[in-house]
């Protein structure tokens, strides 16, 4: 059974935020495959069905308390991505560090318009 097909993230100004996601998502294993005036689309292939991540312009969108978390293969990958998000303009970075319980290592941050994101790794028990 498929658990997640796609994420459609809303942003108030696509042109302002596009460079952030065009650097972040490829570092997470996504490939950009579509760009139109108000929408970017990325996909990630793996052992399961293809996953899609869209960034859509919605001028009246305001960030809220929702958070999207991405999986990292290792603690080192979380650390590498934490450096990248700082370099590309992430806001309110917390971590990387252990949080949420034993073996849960993550960095929490916001994109340049305030959408909440996370990159995490769960150590094997």
For each predicted feature, which ranges?
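Short polar/acidic secondary-structure junctions
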Residues: 58-60, 98
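Core segments of cupin and vicinal oxygen chelate
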Residues: 8-51
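Eukaryotic scaffold repeat domains enriched in small/polar residues
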Residues: 54-55
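Vicinal oxygen chelate
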Residues: 5-12, 60-84, 87-125
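Short amphipathic alpha-helices in soluble, non-transmembrane regions
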Residues: 20-23, 81-86
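Alpha-helical elements of the RecA-like P-loop NTPase motor core of helicases
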Residues: 18-19, 79, 117
